[in-house]
From Swiss-Prot:
Signal peptide: none annotated. SUPFAM superfamilies: lambda repressor-like DNA-binding domains, Periplasmic binding protein-like I. GO terms for molecular function: DNA-binding transcription factor activity; transcription cis-regulatory region binding. It comes from Staphylococcus xylosus. The keyword Mitochondrion does not apply. Residues 4-23 bind DNA. Keywords: DNA-binding, Repressor, Transcription, Transcription regulation. Pfam families: LacI (PF00356), Peripla_BP_3 (PF13377). This is HTH-type transcriptional regulator MalR. Residues 1-56 form the HTH lacI-type domain. It comes from the Bacteria.
Length: 337
């Protein structure tokens, strides 16, 4: 295997000079740089990541912090699409990625601390925004570059990529009101996440401008509890005309409960959710959704993280990704039911 030492001997320079050429050090003369690069090419030498790390004091790796690495969360279409955007943008810029793999918050904190301690990453992308998050405190205390997908809660100068979830939820609710709905149920994921709060806020904004009514309920993804809740609504004849869920997986859990309870969509009840994916398109019936373009969120987060790591000036601390309502068979005009 060809090493940096072999390249240095063949080019008649020191190993430190080869390292500086690999790192792109501008103090190396053009003549020396070209000589070393020609020697590397003649040996078909490609610096491995360890060599680059030693030369540049950087790992060329970005850490990805997920809220959980449970099967449920890691297979969420939103997460998969965001990661696809991150991976493609990082690959185009020569960066690798490493993700947290634990399910509990305290375990994720330890993972992040180890990545920082061993200089495994140059910066982080956080895939969520949560109130009183100790992981953000860790990143700040170590002055680590990071980007949030979501809305930051404190510092205005945190680089973040997000949708306008208040506006998106407000638009979805108005769309349903225009369909004749006036009795809503908004089912939200537990966990104190800012995206959920914003979607509830937008929903309430739209409701308050009409004579419609709504209830907000929070569910962990617990099938038994959700089934009992809707069974009770059926028995007391208090079903809403439409259920909005804050999350696609929560929506599909509710769809399966409706199937068990023999509630037919859209004749008995209607449904809508956030984050379009193949799950929504292939559902029975296909689900009306708000497309939040998660791959664009991932690409934007990766690009911003790379720019920060490379020391580029950041002109905009906030990048907004648009949203679109995708109308499908799970919603229809009430008079047509």
């Amino acid at each position: 295997m060809v090493t940096i030492k072999d390249i240095a001997q063949a080019a008649n320079v020191s190993t430190s000079t080869v390292s500086r050429v690999i790192s792109g050090n501008p103090r190396i003369s053009m003549q020396t740089r070209e000589k070393v690069k020609a020697t590397m090419k003649s040996f078909n030498y490609q610096p491995n990541r360890a060599a680059r790390t030693l030369a540049t004091k950087q790992s060329n790796t970005i850490g990805i912090i997920q809220k959980s690495a449970s099967i449920e969360d890691s297979q969420n279409p939103f997460v998969l699409d965001v990661l696809s955007g991150i991976f493609s943008k990082c690959k185009n810029h020569g960066y690798a990625t490493i993700s947290t793999t634990k399910g509990q918050s305290i375990e994720i904190e330890l993972e992040v601390q180890e990545m920082i301690h061993y200089h495994s990453v140059d910066g982080f992308i956080v895939l969520y925004s949560k109130k009183s998050d100790p992981i953000i405190d860790i990143l700040k205390s170590h002055a680590m570059p990071y980007v949030i997908i979501g809305k930051p809660l404190t510092d205005d100068d945190i680089i973040h990529i997000d949708n306008d979830n208040v506006s998106a939820s407000q638009s979805l609710t108005r769309y349903l009101i225009d369909k004749g709905h006036n009795k809503f149920l908004f089912v939200a994921e537990t966990g104190n996440y800012e995206v959920v709060k914003d979607r509830i806020a937008g929903h309430l904004n739209a409701i308050e401008q009409t004579d419609s009514v709504t209830d907000i309920v929070y569910f962990a993804k617990n099938r038994h509890y959700i089934r009992s809740f809707f069974q009770d609504l059926i028995e007391h004849r208090t079903l809403p005309t439409v259920v909005i869920t804050s999350d696609t997986l929560l929506n599909h859990l509710i769809l399966s409960v409706f199937y068990e309870l023999k509630l037919h969509i859209p004749t008995d009840i209607q449904t809508a959710t956030f984050n379009d994916s193949y799950l929504n398109a292939f559902a029975s019936p296909p689900q009306t959704t708000v497309d939040i373009y998660p791959k664009l969120l991932g690409e934007g987060a990766a690009e911003s993280a790379i720019n920060i790591i490379q020391g580029h000036n950041i002109l905009n601390f906030y990048k907004l990704i648009p949203t679109t309502i995708i109308e499908r068979e799970s919603t229809t005009t009430i008079q047509e039911v």
